Amino acid sequence: MRILLIILCWALAWPVFSQKSKSRPDYEPLFGKSQASYKVTSSSLKGATFYLVSGHGGPDPGCIGRYQGKELHEDEYAYDIILRLGRELLMRGAKVHFIIQDAKDGIRNTSILKNSKRETCMGSPIPLNQIARLQQRCNKINQLHRKEKGIYKRAVFIHVDSRARRNQTDVYFYHAQGSTQGKAMARQLQRTFAAKYDRHQPNRGFDGTVSARNLFVLRNTTPVAVFMELGNIQNAQDQKRLVIPSNRQALARWIAEGIVKDYQRVKKK
């Protein structure tokens, strides 16, 4: 009789335990302590897989600009935005691989992101040699891609450009030569950004372009890929896009929303 009562109590309590476990947030330590916990709030990207790559890293800081007497390092801002983008994608139900990782940085809500050389390619030291560095991240993406199933697997590369200080540039998008799916994704991202600027800054316009480029990482990655340049790190206006944390978050959110639309396009086929 006592055993029956124990079983009955356990059966009655099980739905409560089950509900609690389902409501627990997911956890990604790369986001840092304050942002590591997140909840999946949508299934809009369920079944999609992403390989997220922030430019440069490790021994290579990428482009360097100056803002209020401080240095802005391309790799730090690209990495912060990649983390924010990854979190947005995970919250929409996607599977996300962060190819470049820094175990300490996390998502940072400061204007000046201090440079470090801690970044790795999923735990492996990043080579100084450019070709070796690029081949390393392509190899990692391709290895992961071969192991996974699904109709929508995308590599996203994020960089910051460096031009003459007077040249203000909008976000622009590259795809591999001959990649119809890469071009379609890039165009959807471009349309999303144009619509966002029309809404938030009427009459501003948006001049971000889409074009094919013969870049090493676009040539040598197996999944469909898009490569983004987020602005000119030397230009005062473009720097605001990078140094203001809410602007970095907006960039991540807009990219995620454009990706959702592209995923919906593919699923309709």
Model-predicted segments: where are they?
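Catalytic-site microenvironment of enzymes
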Residues: 2-269
